[in-house]
C-alpha cells in the first residue's frame, strides 16, 4: 500500500488525540496518516543558530512526524516575511498591507528548497505526497529538481486572489509556474479555482483541457474543488464529553438568562473583527431594549505578534472593546467579554451549544470550520442561528444560515 506524506509549514499532529485540543483538520490528517502508515513533515517551530538539515523523527499518538529546525533568518524572511507579510495579505485581497522585500522572496525560496532536500531521501517510490498551503507553493518544483517523480498534490487553505491583484506580486508568473509541477491542485471553492484558471488562461496564455485540466508552461495539471468538512461524529463526542457538558452548563449559568452571541477567531485583520465590534456597537446604540439582554463572547487568540499589522489590529480591538464596554456596561452586565486565549475543542463545543447566535463574519477567509462546528454543536430541537459572511468559503455550499456582508453594521 502507498504511504501518504503530508508536508506543511507546521506539524499539527496531536500528541494526545483524547485531549480534544487539536483542530478538526489536524485530527482528520492524523487519522489518514495512521491508516496509510504515513509521515507528516514540516517545521518544528524551533530555531537554531545554523542550518543543519537534520530531521527529527518522532511518534505522536501513532503518527510518524519529521521535524526540521529553522534558522532565525529563515523564520524572519520565509515565515514572518514572504508567507505572512506578502502572500497572506495578497491572498486575502489586502494589497495595501502586502510588503514586497527581495529578502523575503529569497528566504521563501531557500526554505522550500531546504525542506525538499531534507524530505527527498525519506520518500519511497510509491509514496503519495500531499503539500498544504501557501507556505509551500514551490515544493513540488524543488522535489522534481531532485528527481522525485511521485504523485504530488497541493491544497490551498486560503482564498486564491483575483488576477488583477495577483499581478501586483513581483515574480507572480514564476510562483504560478512552480505550481505546474504538482499533479493535482485543490481549492475550497469553485470561485477560487476559477480565479486560478483565469490567471493561467488570461495572463499566462494557458489552455483548458478535459474537466478541470490546465496546460501551461509546457506542463499539465489537474485542478479540483474539495470543500473541507469536519468530523461531525468526533465533534459531537467533544460536545457531549464531560468537559464539553461542564462548559455548556458553566456558560448557561454565566449567561444568567441573557442571550449569548459568540465569535471565535484567530486575531487577524482578515476576520472582520473591527467591523464586527462596530456593528455590535451600532446594534446596542439602535436597540436600547436589548442592552442587558444579550452579550458578545469574543474569543480571539493572539497570532503572528511579530508582524506589525497584527500588532496594530490587536491595539485597535483592545481599544474598541474597552470603549464599547465603557459606554454601555452596567453594574451587573458587560456587553462584550473579549478574551485573548485559546480553548480546547470540547470546551468550544460547549460554548457553541450555549450560544444563541454564532458570528462568522470575515472580510475574506478560507473555509472557516468554526461555522460548521457551530452548526454541529446545536441542539436540533432548539438550535441557535449562524450569521455567516458571504466572503467565507463556508458560505458557498450552505443553505442553513443567514448570509451577511461583514462591512454592514448589524441592525
What do these predicted ranges mean?
Residues 1-73:
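N-terminal low-complexity, Ser/Thr- and acidic-residue-enriched intrinsically disordered segments
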Residues 268-284:
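A conserved mid-protein helix/loop that constitutes part of the nucleotide-sugar donor-binding site
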Residues 349-366, 375-376, 381-383, 391-393:
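Acidic donor-binding loop of glycosyltransferase active sites
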Residues 75-128, 243-250, 254-256, 337-346:
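Conserved nucleotide-sugar donor-binding subdomain of glycosyltransferases
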Residues 300-346:
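Nucleotide-activated donor-binding/catalytic signature segment of Leloir-type glycosyltransferases, i.e.
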Residues 255-270, 296-297:
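Conserved donor-binding/catalytic core segment of Leloir-type glycosyltransferases
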Amino acid at each position: 500500500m502507498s504511504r501518504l506524506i503530508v508536508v506543511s509549514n507546521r506539524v499539527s499532529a496531536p500528541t494526545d488525540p483524547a485531549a480534544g485540543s487539536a483542530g478538526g483538520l489536524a485530527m482528520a490528517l492524523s487519522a489518514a496518516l495512521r491508516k496509510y502508515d504515513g509521515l507528516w513533515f514540516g517545521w518544528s517551530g524551533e530555531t537554531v543558530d545554523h542550518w543543519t538539515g537534520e530531521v527529527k523523527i518522532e511518534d505522536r499518538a501513532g503518527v510518524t512526524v519529521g521535524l526540521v529546525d529553522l534558522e532565525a533568518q529563515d523564520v524572519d524572511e520565509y515565515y514572518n516575511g514572504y508567507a505572512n507579510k506578502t502572500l497572506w495579505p495578497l491572498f486575502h485581497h489586502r494589497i495595501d498591507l502586502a510588503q514586497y522585500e527581495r529578502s523575503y522572496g529569497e528566504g521563501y525560496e531557500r526554505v522550500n528548497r531546504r525542506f525538499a532536500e531534507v524530505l527527498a531521501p525519506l520518500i519511497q517510490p510509491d509514496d503519495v505526497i500531499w503539500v498544504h498551503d501557501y507556505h509551500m507553493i514551490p515544493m513540488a518544483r524543488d522535489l522534481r529538481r531532485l528527481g522525485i517523480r511521485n504523485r504530488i498534490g497541493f491544497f490551498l487553505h486560503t482564498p486564491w486572489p483575483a488576477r488583477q491583484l495577483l499581478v501586483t506580486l513581483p515574480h507572480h508568473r514564476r510562483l504560478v509556474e512552480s505550481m505546474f509541477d504538482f499533479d493535482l491542485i485543490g481549492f475550497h471553492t469553485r470561485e477560487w479555482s476559477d480565479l486560478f484558471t483565469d490567471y493561467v488562461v488570461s495572463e499566462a496564455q494557458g489552455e483548458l483541457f478535459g474537466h478541470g485540466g490546465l496546460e501551461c508552461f509546457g506542463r499539465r495539471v489537474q485542478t479540483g474543488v474539495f470543500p473541507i468538512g469536519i468530523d461531525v461524529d468526533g465533534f459531537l463526542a467533544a460536545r457531549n464529553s464531560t468537559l464539553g457538558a461542564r462548559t455548556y452548563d458553566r456558560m448557561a449559568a454565566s449567561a444568567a438568562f441573557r442571550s449569548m452571541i459568540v465569535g471565535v477567531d484567530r486575531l487577524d485583520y482578515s476576520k472582520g473583527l473591527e467591523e464586527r465590534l462596530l456593528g455590535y456597537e451600532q446594534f446596542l446604540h439602535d436597540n436600547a431594549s436589548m442592552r442587558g439582554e444579550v452579550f458578545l463572547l469574543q474569543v480571539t487568540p493572539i497570532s503572528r505578534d511579530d508582524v506589525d499589522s497584527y500588532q496594530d489590529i490587536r491595539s485597535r480591538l483592545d481599544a474598541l472593546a474597552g470603549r464599547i464596554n465603557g459606554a454601555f456596561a452596567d453594574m451587573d452586565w458587560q456587553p462584550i467579554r473579549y478574551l485573548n486565549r485559546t480553548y480546547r475543542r470540547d470546551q468550544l463545543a460547549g460554548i457553541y451549544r450555549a450560544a444563541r447566535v454564532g458570528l462568522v463574519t470575515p472580510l475574506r477567509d478560507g473555509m472557516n470550520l468554526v461555522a460548521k462546528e457551530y452548526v454541529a454543536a446545536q441542539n436540533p430541537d432548539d438550535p441557535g442561528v449562524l450569521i455567516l459572511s458571504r466572503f467565507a468559503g463556508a458560505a458557498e455550499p450552505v443553505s442553513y444560515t443567514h448570509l451577511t456582508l461583514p462591512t454592514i453594521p448589524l441592525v
